[in-house]
Amino acid sequence: MELILQLYLLPYNPLRPVICFDERPCFLIGDRIKGLEMKKGEVAKENYAYTKHGSCCVLAAIEPLTGKRFAHIRPQRRRVEFAEFMKDLADLYPDAEKIIVVLDNLNTHNFSSFFHTFDAQTAAKLMDRFEFVFTPKSASWLNMVEIEFSALSRQCLNRRISVSYTHLRAHETAR
């Protein structure tokens, strides 16, 4: 725990940026029956019936000292998605000697994901670019990206999202 707190206290170093990473499931659920219109002074009424449009995974990272945010939406949360996200992250920091990533102990969060996804040479290069710092068990709250997910959930994800993964992905790539 102290190691992560010490990382957050370090001054900004573009050669060794500190990035916080995590992922979150997102369920794509729409209304089957339209709710009642809201009247003045009353709350909106939603019907309990819904339609499922599948699920997806939001992968996100923040750089706390600069405020930079990165996100991907993917249909699943596997080692392939993790490795591809880390490769994209490495591409965003071409001059960095080491990218320090704070993340939890999920089974996909390791260097073997690189070797599973990419050829050995690419995986080895990626492995050299990263230093993983894992949050202690039951202490994922130390990861600052959790604050971002909390805000994102309250503002967007904790409601019915009545679009398909394809539509949501098209919206992500349009930004």
Regions found by a protein language model. Give the residues of each.
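Extended, low-complexity cationic-aromatic segments
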Residues: M1-K87
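Short, polar/flexible loop-turn hinges at active-site or ligand-entry regions and domain interfaces
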Residues: C156-Y165
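Single conserved hydrophobic/aromatic residue that forms the stacking wall/gate
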Residues: H167-A170, A174-R175
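RNase H-like two-metal-ion nuclease catalytic core shared by retroviral integrases
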Residues: D104-N105, F132-R154
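Short beta-strand segments
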Residues: I19-F21, I100-L103, V133-F134
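Short, basic/hydrophobic alpha-helical segments
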Residues: E81-I100
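Short catalytic/ligand-binding loop motif for oxyanion handling, primarily in non-cytosolic enzymes
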Residues: F27-I29, T108-F111, W141-L142
